[in-house]
Regions:
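Acidic/polar loop patches that form or flank catalytic/metal-binding clefts of enzymes
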Residues: 284, 295-302
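Structural motif
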Residues: 42-43, 71-74, 168-169, 201-204, ...
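A conserved regulatory-domain signal marking ACT and ACT-like small-molecule sensing domains
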Residues: 309-468
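Acidic, Ala/Val/Gly-enriched low-complexity intrinsically disordered segments
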Residues: 2-3, 7-20, 32, 38
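Nucleotide/pyrophosphate-binding catalytic subdomain
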Residues: 22-24, 29-283, 288, 451-456
């Protein structure tokens, strides 16, 4: 990286200018300048399963880590899929546990798991006696083996191998990531424990799990290694948290629908949360909070294209970000819209409360609520099917909307993240010109929500992307 230069004023009567250079690790000052503290940069790099699927990808991770000396803390997932027909190690471990519950041998599955890690060890030229680790785990398996204890072993083995490959210290996540009895992260205790264990050293720690007060292993939900990376960055006051995956950042649209969508250069924490809420699957839902609390930027990058900057997520407001009127799109499909009408509905909070309670009573999952003049619009989906949806609509009518409830099924919601209201008319025109009617629009800042027929969702998304 080309040296950046910055001038500081020396605290003296002469107010001379002192020039400092940034070398990628920290600020370097002239020898006679002692009035500034040099801060060494720290990057926490988390690598997902797709980046760790085989020995070749392990070696690629080593190149990435070695290319920046600030990457002194590494968090790893279990080995992912090597190709489309392959299985993630975590999926195989879940299957092993299911076999144990029904007292069926999981030996064949275990051999597949063992072969993956032995191949990685051999392909990387490592010496770790991984067979001993695998044998010890298998020997401990019984029908009483805890699910979390078993499925966490993928991350554990990945971290053991990566620590040897990088010549970093292995730090077990169970030794620092603390949960309470209800499974909530104990932030202060976890941060203090990692600070003590890391103590300025280069470390590798497994993602996805920690330890309960009882000593038992506890995992996050799937994708939880993202959370571990964020917690490690927050604990150590990192300058940057990197999340390495197989895509070049957060894409502006679903690549299975839009051909070669561009990555988004910058998102604020709030913008990322908004896109996640409306269906963009980027990070584990709990991964942003620790970084946001510490104001630590998150960089999402691709191990396949490490030269690309990826997407940066940070504390700056959208006004300070690279400007684009239409930034990106996300959405949900398989929704229904219920529209209840009643005079004075918007002035009766108790009726709104009862209306939403009625929908929840029938098992509806609410996606979005908009209250207008004498009208309540709810976007929701019913896990129990159409009959439950219409039963919920009838209960809503009885509870809060005697003037009627209209139900429209088979809808999709397209959410457009925008920076500037002037883009709205252009976006709506593009979708309508593509022959897609918009049944409802609502501003859910910083996104505009547009309800379309589910069968036309992909057409609407392509038209919206072309309107950027």
């Amino acid at each position: 990286m080309a040296a950046q230069r910055i001038a500081f004023e020396r605290e003296s009567a002469l107010s001379e200018s002192v020039v400092a250079s940034y070398n990628g690790l920290g600020w370097i000052y002239p020898n006679d300048c002692c009035c500034f503290e040099v801060k060494t940069m720290l990057t926490v790099a988390k690598f997902g399963g797709s980046s760790l699927a085989d020995a070749e990808r392990f070696l690629r991770v080593r190149e990435i880590v070695r290319s920046d000396i600030s990457r002194r803390v590494v968090v790893v997932s279990a080995a992912g899929k090597r190709h489309p027909g392959d299985h993630k190690i975590t999926d195989l471990l879940y299957l092993c546990h299911a076999h144990l519950q029904y007292k069926i041998s999981c030996w064949d599955l275990w051999r597949r798991i063992a072969a993956r890690y032995i191949d990685i060890r051999n392909g990387c030229g490592l010496k770790l006696p991984v067979e001993e680790e695998l044998d010890a785990i298998y020997a401990s398996l019984t029908p009483e083996t805890g699910l979390d204890a078993l499925v966490s072993r993928g991350e554990y083995l990945s971290a053991k191998l990566m620590a040897e490959l990088l010549d970093y210290q292995f730090v077990d996540a169970a030794d620092w990531l603390r949960f309470d009895c209800a499974g909530n992260v104990l932030y202060a205790e976890s941060y203090a424990a990692l600070q003590s264990l890391a103590d300025g050293r280069k470390i590798v720690t497994p993602g996805f799990y920690g330890r309960l007060p009882s000593g038992a292993i506890r995992t996050f939900s799937r994708g939880g290694s993202d959370v571990t990376g964020s917690l490690a960055a927050a604990a150590l006051h990192a300058d940057v948290c990197e999340n390495w995956t197989d895509v070049p950042g957060i894409l502006a649209a679903d690549p299975s629908i839009v051909e070669r969508p561009e990555p988004i250069a910058y998102l604020s924490y709030e913008e990322l949360q908004a896109l996640s809420t409306v269906g963009m699957q980027v990070l584990h839902e709990s991964a942003v909070l620790p970084l946001r609390q510490r104001q630590i930027p998150l960089q999402i990058r691709s191990t396949l294209r490490p030269e690309l900057p990826g997407t940066r997520i940070g504390p700056l407001p959208a006004a300070d970000a690279p400007q684009a009127e239409l930034v990106g799109f996300a959405g949900r499909r398989g929704l229904a819209m219920l529209r209840a009408e009643r005079a004075g509905l918007e002035q009766a909070p108790e009726l709104l409360r009862d209306a939403l309670a009625a929908l929840g009573q029938k098992g509806l999952k609410i996606f979005h609520v908009a209250c207008g003049l004498e009208q309540l619009t709810v976007l929701a989906y019913s896990p129990d099917g159409s009959d439950a949806l219409h039963a919920a609509a009838e209960l809503l009518r009885q509870t809060a909307a005697p003037e009627g409830v209209k139900v429209r099924e088979n809808l999709g919601v397209l959410a457009a993240l925008h920076r500037g209201a002037e883009a709205t008319s252009r976006l709506v025109s593009a979708i309508q010109n593509a022959g897609v009617p918009i049944h409802h629009m609502a501003e859910a800042a910083p996104c505009l929500l547009m309800v379309v027929n589910d069968s036309q969702y992909e057409t609407a998304l392509r038209a919206a992307y072309q309107a950027r």
